[in-house]
Amino acid sequence: MLLRGVLLALQALQLAGALDLPAGSCAFEESTCGFDSVLASLPWILNEEGHYIYVDTSFGKQGEKAVLLSPDLQAEEWSCLRLVYQITTSSESLSDPSQLNLYMRFEDESFDRLLWSAKEPSDSWLIASLDLQNSSKKFKILIEGVLGQGNTASIALFEIKMTTGYCIECDFEENHLCGFVNRWNPNVNWFVGGGSIRNVHSILPQDHTFKSELGHYMYVDSVYVKHFQEVAQLISPLTTAPMAGCLSFYYQIQQGNDNVFSLYTRDVAGLYEEIWKADRPGNAAWNLAEVEFSAPYPMEVIFEVAFNGPKGGYVALDDISFSPVHCQNQTELLFSAVEASCNFEQDLCNFYQDKEGPGWTRVKVKPNMYRAGDHTTGLGYYLLANTKFTSQPGYIGRLYGPSLPGNLQYCLRFHYAIYGFLKMSDTLAVYIFEENHVVQEKIWSVLESPRGVWMQAEITFKKPMPTKVVFMSLCKSFWDCGLVALDDITIQLGSCSSSEKLPPPPGECTFEQDECTFTQEKRNRSSWHRRRGETPTSYTGPKGDHTTGVGYYMYIEASHMVYGQKARLLSRPLRGVSGKHCLTFFYHMYGGGTGLLSVYLKKEEDSEESLLWRRRGEQSISWLRALIEYSCERQHQIIFEAIRGVSIRSDIAIDDVKFQAGPCGEMEDTTQQSSGYSEDLNEIEY
């Protein structure tokens, strides 16, 4: 099933002292080292000759899973988890290959955290590197193989290794090279030097680690360069946890005038940034380089050498290390996402206005059938510009954010709503104010906005100097002006598009891509439906989703149902843990005939369901937040049940469901409102 040629390389890869591997590690030579198959899934099978463990796909069906669970682990120091694996495929399964997922399971959480996923088939072994932040909490590693199409494909694990340290560190003494890879070039590439490897064209150095011919390092030589500006790149594993500090390494350069040795970072969006360049050849010995390195979001480090011709000599690299302590004479650029964000529930946070007079007013509107509330909870505060207290011809309202350090990439997200403007030009715009140059640059302005819908905007920006974000609303004439609402401003490090390429947060569902892990007892016209935009029936249902205003939500279409008919949406089975759970979600109940929305807890092996929360009748034209705190130490499911009311104006919707470990930080008023008819609504099963 597996390519036998892979085994020869693996025997060199696996450590001779496999039995002494640290906790959380296994070379699968004679045992699975405490990693066990979960009985309710397909088994992982240890190869008779050792070397690897695999999933037998010959009898499995597409979509079936094989789950491997580690013993209890603890990472009190920063650790690196490396996985050597292979996914093979057949010609019939190219469109739907098998998949390998790696999760982290904490003892006090009902959901597993997806750390990594891969489904790229390969004819040789591959390596994945994952940074694990230090934590006092115990956890398990869960490895899940999902079968693709065809029964000749395979999923195999050759080694799992968990060691103290950072995945970006490497001395190049092991065959897997710590997950560093060379970007292949026909003429110039990075090679392993030292040991028994010798190059006849250049006099290469001894390695730095052992300072002998027994050690290894990486080098790139110009002897095969055929063109000017030939480039060789050595690419590190992608960082998977935020880190900042001092990145150090040793290097040697021969004939430095004919080559350029540089260090870059590259994020998941493909954006490069040069963070270091060798300014002189250095001496004949190994030279130490220390570089201030910050990876608040996933990125790779790229060691790049550019040659100007075949006489450019060589560049050698060894002993890459990282320390969370910053380099000499360097200080960390302090940035706090919390201090740079605001939902205006308590005050303006670190935002402020022009001294000439307040243009933005912090308001709280009790939502009803005619007025929408804030975006955060539906019942809280937001900012309003062009109110009756500020609106005047030529009025300009400016809201300044806190100072942001320069030379960092930021993602700005906020929600806004526009009411009553005849023209959208300059209704709301965002500027970047460079403090040192007193220059403002417009980076966004509203083009169109449906009335009464909270819309999300997201902007990625980066400036070399310290900056501030400025929200500006302009009222050119009294007759053209309406209201501008602003809420839930967040500023985070990294590109806004980065989140699309990261694993989704555990226990969260926005319904943007699909229904997540929710299922339905019955799926027909009277079921829960995933939708974007307005619902078909007027005077009921939301105009847009809660997440972005233009995304998806789940709802029942009352015109397809009869009075008392119900639809049920079930979560996947959740692990029972000790302590409190907090379930939050947003619900929309607008329409004169609105029925009931209930949330139930169903415990494993119990026929009865416990009611956790309920709302009945028309609530508001707004999305409202619900918080439910509950406890359950047994496996269980959460059920969202919507019941159609007395008329077709009974659409009910939910969005942005989130499960969290621990108690809810705040609890809303649990007073239930009544629409005047029976609570059970003559429930009908269909």
Swiss-Prot record:
Any single Gene Ontology cellular-component annotation: endoplasmic reticulum
Main location: secreted
Positions of region (Disordered): 521-543, 665-686
CDD domains hit by this protein: MAM
MAM domain segment(s): 24-169, 168-329, 340-498, 507-666
Post-translational modification: O-glycosylated.
Gene3D superfamilies, sorted: 2.60.120.200
First and last residue of the signal peptide: 1-18
UniProt keywords, alphabetically: Extracellular matrix, Glycoprotein, Repeat, Secreted, Signal
Residues carrying a glycan: N134, N329, N524
Disulfide bonds: none
Compartment(s) of residence: Secreted, Extracellular space, Extracellular matrix
Domain of life from the UniProt record: Eukaryota
PANTHER family in alphabetical order: APICAL ENDOSOMAL GLYCOPROTEIN PRECURSOR, MAM DOMAIN-CONTAINING PROTEIN
Protein name (Swiss-Prot/TrEMBL): MAM domain-containing protein 2
Provenance organism: Homo sapiens
Recorded name of the encoding gene: MAMDC2
